[in-house]
Amino acid sequence: MSDQKTQHLPTAIFVMGPTASGKTALSVALRQHLPVELISVDSALIYRGMDIGTAKPTTEEQALAPHRLINILDPSQPYSAADFCHDALKEMAEITASGRIPLLVGGTMLYFKALLEGLSPLPSANPVIRAQIEQQAAEQGWDALHQQLQKIDPAAALRIHPNDPQRLSRALEVFLISGKTLTELTTLSGESLPYRVHQFAIAPAKRELLHQRIEARFHQMLESGFEEEVKALYARHDLHVDLPSIRCVGYRQMWSYLSGEIDYDEMIYRGICATRQLAKRQITWLRGWKSVHWLDSSQPEQALSTVMQVVSA
């Protein structure tokens, strides 16, 4: 939407960025300076009992700046981009009605995109077809399915990594159900967000610094009891590695360690690598984002000042 068209709309703020980039710290600081209420945009923070491995805001941070849409589901429950849009729009309306500004913070870019552009008319999940895809993957490997996707939907195959079974499975499922590719259907997006949105992306200017932060944070999680947290989940009979909650970065690798598939050092190595890959994907998404103000997380005071100036303009 053009500035002229959005002038009469209520304001919203997006704080986006890769994992370990300082999004929470910036949002908590903004809460001290602006009349904002925070909404989490994170597909892992929605789950209860998954606090350490998701780097959930601390008790102190939550006291300073309560986050909505955190701890709303059990790890056994599914949650889609459509579910998020429904919940986020409701929270945003409540915040706006109270005379405050919704500040949406997180790293799940698909949720931000769905909220901004509206959801595409994608078919609902089909358990039978999904099971067939999982069976084929078990027999042939996900690389073979990725090659299949390249023939069906080359554009989606470029976006989706062979090591991302959740998105790969969904792309194939959509085609098998509808006869149309994911790329075709995602061009038919819904209504745009009825807010004047100020979008910010925060990340260190140097990639090496982000890598160092990710490694340090993973070790800090282990020292804080991450293994014990996942052991409690592993002991439950209703949770398994194919659930979105257990597929979360860090949890999947710890699960493999607890099941005896890999040793402790390999778990650490894979956990850090997977987190770096996630950060790379998040940055790639953001580089293609329109109308975003980039902030350097290694200069938090300057980042805060930039947001204040843009929002107040």
From Swiss-Prot:
For the site labelled Interaction with substrate tRNA, the residues are 108, 130
Cofactor dependence is on:
Mg(2+)
Where substrate binds, per the record, is at 19-24
Keyword set, alphabetical order: ATP-binding, Magnesium, Nucleotide-binding, Transferase, tRNA processing
The UniProt entry, under InterPro entries, shows:
Dimethylallyltransferase (IPR039657), IPT (IPR018022), P-loop_NTPase (IPR027417)
Establish whether keyword ATP-binding is in the entry.
yes
Q: Which residues form a coiled coil?
A: none
Q: Which GO terms describe its biological process?
A: tRNA modification
Q: Which domain of life is it from?
A: Bacteria
The annotated region (Interaction with substrate tRNA) lies at 42-45, 166-170, 247-252, 280-287
Pfam families xrefs: IPPT
Q: Reaction(s) catalyzed by this protein?
A: adenosine(37) in tRNA + dimethylallyl diphosphate = N(6)-dimethylallyladenosine(37) in tRNA + diphosphate
The answer to whether the entry has keyword Zinc-finger is no
The Gene Ontology terms for molecular function here are: ATP binding; tRNA dimethylallyltransferase activity
The EC number(s) this enzyme carries:
2.5.1.75
Record PANTHER family = TRNA DIMETHYLALLYLTRANSFERASE (PTHR11088:SF60)
Q: Which family does it belong to?
A: Belongs to the IPP transferase family.
Under NCBIfam families, the record lists:
miaA
Subunit info here reads:
Monomer.
What is its biological role? Catalyzes the transfer of a dimethylallyl group onto the adenine at position 37 in tRNAs that read codons beginning with uridine, leading to the formation of N6-(dimethylallyl)adenosine (i(6)A).
The protein's name: tRNA dimethylallyltransferase
Q: Which organism is it from?
A: Photorhabdus laumondii subsp. laumondii (strain DSM 15139 / CIP 105565 / TT01) (Photorhabdus luminescens subsp. laumondii)
Recite the lineage of the species: Bacteria, Pseudomonadati, Pseudomonadota, Gammaproteobacteria, Enterobacterales
Give the gene symbol.
miaA
